[in-house]
Amino acid sequence: MMRAYIDTNILVDLVFARKEFLPDAQHIFALGYANEVQLVVSALSFVNTIYLGRKYKYPMDEVYSKLRLIADFVDVADLSGQNVVDVLNSGWNDYEDATQHHSAIEEQADCIVTRNKKDFKASLITVLTPKEFFEQMGSK
């Protein structure tokens, strides 16, 4: 089964129901829920989503509720001290993107799914937009 590492922007689209991007995010997570693909989401993505919820004054009980539901069927990737050190020495300009990339590799993901492919130009694994992901899955 394919292991797809989900970037923070896709998780945020789902949790905050971002109108323009919500259908793709819903479809990605529905595929994971149906066990058609194994989704991997970083602990950092959960933290970033909670931070954004507070920053933009979303009802936090709803944010936590949605994240708990998601955590029930995705693999949550841990961040280790070694991950932090490796990313600091990686040479990437964006620490958060480098952390996601390194975590995806550690989790043996087949791809990273993101709306911002340009953030992963130096990726050692395949990076897909949601549309490309659906094409690869033969879905939508």
Predicted regions and their residues:
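Residues in flexible loops and secondary-structure boundaries
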Residues: K19-P23, D78, V84-V87, Y95, ...
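Acidic, PIN/NYN-like endoribonuclease modules and their adjacent C-terminal/linker elements
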Residues: R3, F73, H102-K140
